[in-house]
A protein has these predicted regions:
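Short, basic/aromatic recognition patches that contact phosphate-bearing ligands
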Residues: 1-85
């Protein structure tokens, strides 16, 4: 299935879709992402940022990898945006 045909997160609340789109943009353009980035940007608690990362990884399982050495998420070589930006 082509990523272009995926309509991600239609069942999620608007606020969570915005956070998931931020996850994608941040990791794609900045090259890394931590839960703290989500927490600072949106003013959410650590549990919410963890849920957002779980949700994004469920929608795009091949886009992010966790680097224990860097303690952050990095884009994979297979990264393909799922949100229309």
């Amino acid at each position: 299935m082509s990523h272009a045909n995926i309509r991600p997160a239609e069942h999620l609340a608007y606020a969570q879709r915005e956070r998931l789109a931020f996850i994608e943009l941040r990791v794609y353009f900045c090259g890394n992402l931590t839960r703290a980035h989500i927490e600072r940007r949106f003013g959410v608690k650590p549990a919410a940022s963890a849920r957002d990362l779980i949700a994004y990884r469920a929608l795009a399982p091949h886009n992010l990898q966790y680097s224990a050495a860097s303690r952050c998420y990095l884009p994979t070589k297979a990264f393909r945006p799922i949100f229309k930006h």
